[in-house]
From Swiss-Prot:
UniProt similarity note: Belongs to the universal ribosomal protein uL29 family.
Taxonomic classification: Bacteria, Pseudomonadati, Pseudomonadota, Alphaproteobacteria, Candidatus Pelagibacterales
GO biological process, one term: translation
GO MF terms held by the record: structural constituent of ribosome
Keyword Cytoplasm: no
UniProt name for this protein: Large ribosomal subunit protein uL29
Keyword entries, A-Z: Ribonucleoprotein, Ribosomal protein
């Protein structure tokens, strides 16, 4: 997700996306352990997207 897309989301949508990405991250890590990962860079991308979403959520909660 791009920063502009994230800023347009509501608080509830941000929370749902964080939960979904955390599940995806768990699955990527599990695949990595079993050597079934197709694209290892997705782990880093997912972590960065979660961080962006959390930052946006924090800003919306403080506003």
């Amino acid at each position: 997700m791009k920063k502009q897309e994230i800023k347009k989301l509501s608080k509830d949508e941000v929370i749902k996306n964080i939960d979904k990405l955390k599940k995806d991250l768990f699955n990527f890590r599990f695949q990595k352990i079993n050597s079934q990962v197709t694209d290892p860079s997705k782990i880093g991308q997912t972590k960065k997207t979660i961080a962006r979403l959390k930052t946006t959520l924090k800003g919306k909660l403080n506003a």
